[in-house]
Design a protein with these regions (language model features):
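Helix-loop boundary and gating motifs at the non-cytosolic
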Residues: 2-62, 262-281
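Helix-to-coil boundary motifs at intracellular loop junctions of multi-pass secondary transporters
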Residues: 40-45, 76-77, 145-152
């Protein structure tokens, strides 16, 4: 039986737990994406540094476009499929896309491992775009559900905290498993990754997807989305934001004029660039 919100603004503990694991699949795959994508395509698939970087760039561009599209469309969606919640419907679409595409991103090209590199490039780019679309679906809708689950600031902070705790745990898990797998299978020189180590990435990928999928099942079974009409939910959200007089609803144009937006974006971008550059010699 799905746990429900015990009071309009208080989320039950089982519901908090179910919500907190709803982004684990994204966290696990994102950790592997940013940490090992360049390593895999350069050392395992034997792409050039430039080609590996282009695949990463394609993924990030697809992510940016998909995030914008899904952000607007998920808000405009009024009902979910077959009576399912509108946010959880988009989230489920994302899970299906991620689970169906991510394993192909970190495995050798099926029946085309000996094909020309340009053909393999197209093969991987196709699955990367699908993966990034699915990742954006799950990320946007999962975060959006916080405002619909509760209007109490303390409860929202708690949900965000639990969500972030699982993000940290997911990153640690990926690094720990990768360290164990590389240490066991890489031979004497554990820093030398070659195409012969493709099975390591295959094992890591299926481990990540398997655990992430289990958490997604917990999320979809364990959390009940609000049954209020979309218009009423949005109205209640606006009232909660403006009730104190401290917060005002911002348009996207005003949001782009906020300096904090660019500060956070630059810090995040340069941090990722430094991390990615250190992965491949």
């Amino acid at each position: 039986m799905e746990p429900v919100v015990s009071q309009p603004d208080v989320v039950s503990k089982p519901a908090k737990l179910a919500y907190s694991v709803g982004h684990v699949l994204n966290d696990l795959t994102a950790s592997m994406w940013f940490s090992y994508l360049l390593v895999f395509y350069h050392r395992i698939v034997n792409f050039t540094n430039a080609s590996s970087g282009y695949l990463l760039l394609i993924g990030q561009i697809a992510d940016a476009l998909a995030t914008t599209f899904i952000g607007f469309e998920s808000d405009r969606t009024r009902t979910g499929l077959f009576g399912y919640g509108r946010r959880k419907t988009w989230h489920l679409i994302g899970v299906i896309c991620v689970v169906g595409s991510f394993p192909f991103c970190f495995n050798l090209c099926i029946d085309c491992a000996n094909s020309d590199l340009w053909a393999q490039f197209i093969y991987y780019a196709m699955f990367i775009v699908i993966f990034q679309f699915g990742w954006s679906c799950s990320q946007i809708t999962h975060l959006s559900m916080i405002n619909e689950l509760t209007h109490k600031e303390g409860e929202r902070v708690a949900l965000n905290s639990f969500r972030y705790a699982w993000t940290v745990a997911s990153n640690i898990f990926v690094y720990a498993i990768a360290s164990v797998l590389l240490g066991v299978h890489s031979g004497n020189d554990k820093t030398d990754i070659t195409p012969a180590d493709a099975h390591i990435f295959r094992t890591l990928t299926f481990t990540v997807v398997g655990i992430g999928l289990f958490c997604m099942i917990m999320f979809h079974i364990g959390l009940k989305e609000s049954t209020l009409p979309a218009e009423e939910t949005e109205h209640r959200l606006q009232l909660s934001l403006t009730a104190s007089g401290k917060l005002k609803r911002m348009t996207w144009k005003k949001f782009l004029l906020e300096k904090e937006f660019y500060q956070c974006a630059l810090i995040w971008m340069f941090t990722r660039v430094i991390l990615n550059v250190t992965q491949v010699e």
